[in-house]
Amino acid sequence: MRSQFKDDFSFEKRKTESQRIREKYPDRIPVICEKVDKSDIAAIDKKKYLVPSDLTVGQFVYVIRKRIKLSPEKAIFIFIDEILPPTAALMSTIYEEHKSEDGFLYITYSGENTFGTVFPF
Protein backbone atom coordinates (compact mmCIF):
# COMPACT_ATOMS: atom_id res chain seq x y z
CA MET A 1 0.00 0.00 0.00
CA ARG A 2 1.21 3.47 -0.88
CA SER A 3 1.87 5.84 2.02
CA GLN A 4 0.82 9.50 1.71
CA PHE A 5 3.54 10.37 4.24
CA LYS A 6 6.18 8.80 1.98
CA ASP A 7 4.76 10.73 -0.98
CA ASP A 8 4.85 14.02 0.93
CA PHE A 9 8.40 13.77 2.32
CA SER A 10 11.66 12.60 0.76
CA PHE A 11 13.44 9.52 2.10
CA GLU A 12 16.29 11.67 3.45
CA LYS A 13 13.91 13.97 5.32
CA ARG A 14 12.01 11.02 6.82
CA LYS A 15 15.22 9.24 7.84
CA THR A 16 16.67 12.39 9.42
CA GLU A 17 13.46 12.98 11.36
CA SER A 18 13.20 9.40 12.65
CA GLN A 19 16.86 9.48 13.76
CA ARG A 20 16.29 12.78 15.57
CA ILE A 21 13.20 11.35 17.29
CA ARG A 22 15.00 8.14 18.35
CA GLU A 23 17.95 10.14 19.75
CA LYS A 24 15.68 12.50 21.69
CA TYR A 25 13.20 9.81 22.81
CA PRO A 26 15.03 6.45 22.86
CA ASP A 27 12.12 4.73 24.67
CA ARG A 28 9.60 5.79 21.99
CA ILE A 29 8.77 4.38 18.57
CA PRO A 30 8.07 6.69 15.60
CA VAL A 31 4.87 5.45 13.95
CA ILE A 32 3.01 6.65 10.86
CA CYS A 33 -0.63 5.56 10.92
CA GLU A 34 -2.78 6.01 7.81
CA LYS A 35 -6.19 4.81 6.64
CA VAL A 36 -6.38 2.18 3.89
CA ASP A 37 -7.36 4.11 0.73
CA LYS A 38 -10.76 2.63 -0.05
CA SER A 39 -11.89 1.94 3.51
CA ASP A 40 -15.18 3.45 4.66
CA ILE A 41 -13.83 4.14 8.16
CA ALA A 42 -13.13 7.71 9.32
CA ALA A 43 -9.80 9.34 8.47
CA ILE A 44 -7.48 10.06 11.37
CA ASP A 45 -6.64 13.65 12.32
CA LYS A 46 -2.98 12.94 13.03
CA LYS A 47 -0.68 10.49 11.22
CA LYS A 48 2.50 10.71 13.26
CA TYR A 49 2.78 9.11 16.70
CA LEU A 50 5.50 8.63 19.31
CA VAL A 51 4.50 5.36 20.92
CA PRO A 52 5.94 4.01 24.19
CA SER A 53 7.96 0.89 23.39
CA ASP A 54 6.12 -1.15 26.04
CA LEU A 55 2.69 -0.43 24.52
CA THR A 56 0.91 -3.44 23.03
CA VAL A 57 -0.67 -3.47 19.58
CA GLY A 58 -4.07 -3.72 21.29
CA GLN A 59 -3.40 -0.59 23.32
CA PHE A 60 -2.32 1.25 20.17
CA VAL A 61 -5.56 0.16 18.45
CA TYR A 62 -7.44 1.67 21.40
CA VAL A 63 -5.62 5.00 20.83
CA ILE A 64 -6.57 4.92 17.13
CA ARG A 65 -10.21 4.09 17.95
CA LYS A 66 -10.35 7.13 20.25
CA ARG A 67 -8.73 9.44 17.68
CA ILE A 68 -11.22 8.54 14.95
CA LYS A 69 -14.11 8.40 17.46
CA LEU A 70 -15.07 4.88 16.44
CA SER A 71 -18.09 3.49 18.25
CA PRO A 72 -17.57 0.26 20.24
CA GLU A 73 -19.70 -1.89 17.93
CA LYS A 74 -17.61 -0.99 14.86
CA ALA A 75 -14.62 -3.10 13.89
CA ILE A 76 -11.15 -1.77 13.14
CA PHE A 77 -8.22 -3.70 11.72
CA ILE A 78 -4.63 -2.52 11.68
CA PHE A 79 -2.02 -3.81 9.28
CA ILE A 80 1.75 -3.76 9.20
CA ASP A 81 3.17 -4.79 5.83
CA GLU A 82 -0.38 -5.88 4.92
CA ILE A 83 -0.49 -8.34 7.83
CA LEU A 84 -2.65 -8.28 10.98
CA PRO A 85 -0.32 -8.15 14.01
CA PRO A 86 -1.29 -9.99 17.22
CA THR A 87 -2.92 -7.62 19.73
CA ALA A 88 -0.69 -8.82 22.58
CA ALA A 89 2.56 -8.10 20.69
CA LEU A 90 4.69 -5.24 22.00
CA MET A 91 5.11 -2.28 19.67
CA SER A 92 8.89 -2.48 20.27
CA THR A 93 8.95 -6.05 18.89
CA ILE A 94 6.83 -5.09 15.89
CA TYR A 95 9.07 -2.06 15.29
CA GLU A 96 12.28 -4.10 15.30
CA GLU A 97 10.81 -6.63 12.87
CA HIS A 98 8.94 -4.27 10.53
CA LYS A 99 10.43 -0.78 10.66
CA SER A 100 10.97 0.87 7.31
CA GLU A 101 14.42 1.79 6.02
CA ASP A 102 13.60 5.41 6.92
CA GLY A 103 13.22 4.44 10.61
CA PHE A 104 9.43 4.77 10.87
CA LEU A 105 6.95 1.98 11.50
CA TYR A 106 4.11 2.25 8.97
CA ILE A 107 0.68 1.12 10.11
CA THR A 108 -2.52 1.21 8.10
CA TYR A 109 -6.04 0.74 9.42
CA SER A 110 -9.36 -0.20 7.92
CA GLY A 111 -12.94 -0.95 8.91
CA GLU A 112 -12.70 -4.31 7.18
CA ASN A 113 -10.12 -7.09 7.03
CA THR A 114 -8.71 -5.97 3.69
CA PHE A 115 -5.70 -8.27 3.50
CA GLY A 116 -6.72 -11.20 5.69
CA THR A 117 -3.32 -12.54 6.74
CA VAL A 118 -2.29 -13.00 10.37
CA PHE A 119 1.29 -12.62 11.59
CA PRO A 120 3.12 -15.96 11.49
CA PHE A 121 4.55 -16.02 15.05
Swiss-Prot record:
InterPro entries: Atg8-like, Ubiquitin-like_domsf. GO terms for molecular function: phosphatidylethanolamine binding. The gene is atg8. The record marks 116-117 as: Cleavage. Interacts with atg43 (via N-terminal atg8 interacting motif); the interaction is direct. Interacts with atg38 (via AIM motif); the interaction is direct and leads to recruitment of the autophagy-specific vps34 PI3-kinase complex I to the phagophore assembly site. Interacts with hfl1. Belongs to the ATG8 family. Residues 117-121 form a propeptide. Its main location: membrane. Pfam families: ATG8. A lipid is attached at residue 116 (Phosphatidylethanolamine amidated glycine). This is Autophagy-related protein 8. It is found in: Cytoplasmic vesicle, Autophagosome membrane; Vacuole membrane. GO terms for biological process: autophagosome assembly; autophagosome maturation; cellular response to nitrogen starvation; macroautophagy; membrane fusion; mitophagy; protein transport; vacuole organization. Ubiquitin-like modifier involved in autophagosome formation. With atg4, mediates the delivery of the autophagosomes to the vacuole via the microtubule cytoskeleton. Required for selective autophagic degradation of the nucleus (nucleophagy) as well as for mitophagy which contributes to regulate mitochondrial quantity and quality by eliminating the mitochondria to a basal level to fulfill cellular energy requirements and preventing excess ROS production. Participates also in membrane fusion events that take place in the early secretory pathway. It comes from the Eukaryota.
